[in-house]
């Protein structure tokens, strides 16, 4: 099975979170690598599995069924999302 990049799940993530997460930085819980979601290796089957490009650990699983989507992020130690339009708190 050929891997896609994280841009392949941009639409699904936007539907769930309401923001573009492709530029968000995720930290792999396995190896500590930090990379944009767009750089994950994505595999589609019954659901979607996203893996760290550095260590191949599963960092995200997306399962859609019955009108809902489950997002499992247990392989991601953290996710940093920039505030929209450069807003500051």
Q: Positions of the model-derived regions?
A:
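A broadly conserved sequence feature marking short terminus-proximal activation segments
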Residues: 1-24
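Basic nucleic-acid-binding interfaces
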Residues: 11-12, 68, 87-89
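Short cysteine-rich clusters marking metal-coordination/redox-active sites
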Residues: 28-31, 52-55
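Short, non-ligating residues that shape and space the ligands of small metal-coordination modules
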Residues: 37-38, 61
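Surface loops and adjacent helix of pleckstrin homology
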Residues: 40, 53, 64-65, 74, ...
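Short linker/helix segments within small regulatory modules
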Residues: 40-49
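Short metal-binding segments enriched for Cys and/or His
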Residues: 56-70, 81-82
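Short, charged, intrinsically disordered terminal tails
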Residues: 73-89
């Amino acid at each position: 099975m050929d891997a896609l990049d994280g841009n392949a799940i941009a639409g699904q993530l936007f539907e769930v979170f309401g923001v573009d997460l492709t530029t968000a930085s995720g930290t792999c819980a396995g190896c500590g690598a930090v990379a944009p979601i767009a750089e994950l290796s994505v595999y589609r089957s019954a659901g979607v599995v996203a893996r760290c490009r550095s260590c191949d650990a599963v960092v995200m699983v997306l399962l859609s069924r019955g009108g809902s989507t489950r997002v499992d992020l247990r392989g991601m130690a953290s996710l940093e999302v920039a505030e929209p339009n450069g807003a500051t708190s």
